[in-house]
Amino acid sequence: MPLSASLLGKNSTYKDSYDATLLFKIPRINNRNELGINSNNLPFYGVDIWNTYELSCLNKNGKPWVGVGTFYIPTDSENIVESKSFKLYLNSFNNFVVESIEELERIILQDLSNVTHAKVTGQIFPINTKIEFGLPSGKNIDDLNIECNNYCPPDNSLIEYEDVLVEEEINSNLLKSNCLVTGQPDWGTIVIKYRGKKLKHDSFLKYLISFRNYNEFAEQCAERIFTDINNSINPDFLSIYIVYTRRGGIDICPYRSLDQNYNLPSNKRLIRQ
């Protein structure tokens, strides 16, 4: 179905009964074709981490239960899930009776796997689980004294480098783009690890800021940034991790890496989550 058929930007009615058909799929291939990415031979590995904070159901006695969930959608999935449809889907469990939280987890993982055409993993946690806040790893580049005048479209010509090999990790809290359909802001913290020609931090920060008024889904922004860096410096190693702020009870955190045997970064919430 075309993106115009989704519920994004439209008035919606919350279903009072569980309904897996609420999940709306978006093919990854459309954006990847634009970026020159071969979906049959991806230049990266990774996942999209979805953290959900509005999750509830009823136990067999009719008593409500609330929790949080974390779900991992692999980058080789055929589709992503449109976030508003996922919110409506999760809320369709509000009056749904389950025998156990394990049953709820199984249902959600199966539904997500069906719509994305991939093996989705994840876990649901009780609401009283202790969660610690974290800090983005690496050197923050936000305090650099730069002059900016490009806020759209993203300009990969701004990525400059020095002809010296380094291994470093940098981060920025200044990444912002807008939802492709609604124009709502997506605020993100990005962490980049790489080994290769040294990125000039001032020009790279300008590049990140050039996304500021750009309309694109979060997962697609991540792959655009990864592709632009990879094409610019051809690093021996590269990974990017973007932690987006919560909207509609959900935050999305894409991770991409050149390393097939990658280790996922800590999924600790940052201060803006």
UniProtKB/Swiss-Prot annotation:
Its main location: cytoplasm. One of its GO terms (cellular component) is cytoplasm. The active site is at 179 (thioimide intermediate), 186 (proton donor). It catalyses: 7-aminomethyl-7-carbaguanine + 2 NADP(+) = 7-cyano-7-deazaguanine + 2 NADPH + 3 H(+). NADPH binds at residues 83-84, 247-248. Signal peptide: none annotated. This is NADPH-dependent 7-cyano-7-deazaguanine reductase. It comes from Rickettsia canadensis (strain McKiel). The gene is queF.
